[in-house]
Amino acid sequence: MKALVAVKRVVDYNVKVRVKTDGSDVDIGNVKMSMNPFDEIAVEEAVRLKEAGKISEIVAISMGEKKCEDTLRTALAMGADRAIHVETDESLSPLTVAKLLKAVAEKEQPSLYLLGKQAIDDDANQTAQMLAALLNAPQGTFAAKVELNDNEVIVTREIDGGTETLALNLPAVLSSDLRLNEPRFVKLPNLMAAKKKPLEKTNPEQLGVAVENRLQTVKYAEPKTRQAGEKVASVAELVAKLKAAKAI
Ligand code: AMP
């Protein structure tokens, strides 16, 4: 059984992204880039399933500029067997990414698709759902627990106020939530060994997918700065202030 795991190269979660002064975009020149944290969780889950003997091959895939190779090498160091880089300098919408994944899947025929629940740069939370729709495959988004059997996958999903458990026929599309697992730390020897693992290159044209952007960004803005708080000396003073502000 094969798993296809999508890993996106995004601005590292520790970086505070600034908006350009003209509001046309965000300034990410020279900032640290990393694998999308939810995708690390997706890779980790695939590796655990392989270690448990449930799947035999993990293929990591990333779409975007040349530097996505670094992200794929990290996935290989974590335990993926081989990687596919769909190289393009165009900006990719979730729908285009889903179409590219579908095009690759036609050749790869995976039983399980593992994605992150959202990319922390665009926060779209759309790709897994769109891919499932394009493939006409069942989806288990926001996965918190995954149990893989021969013909089905049992997924416990995070939903408002609790969890929901679904049994999905294979092939199925899953998206990882935070509680699914804690990704392993990548050790240097594994990174070195990952350099020898196969990394295949392709591009949207070869896959027959037109990169079209149906989204137009109107403007970017910094979130409003929060007003400073105020310390009060007593409960009575707090109540008086709340009354004066007509909050109670
Ligand atoms: P999004 O729908 O943009 O929030 O992304 C959800 C998930 O889709 C991510 O966590 C990745 O697993 C996958 N994904 C999105 N864009 C890419 C990309 N350019 N390359 C690889 N995977 C991607």
Features from the language model and the residues they span:
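N-terminal glycine-rich FAD/FM-binding segment characteristic of electron-transfer flavoproteins
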Residues: 1-248
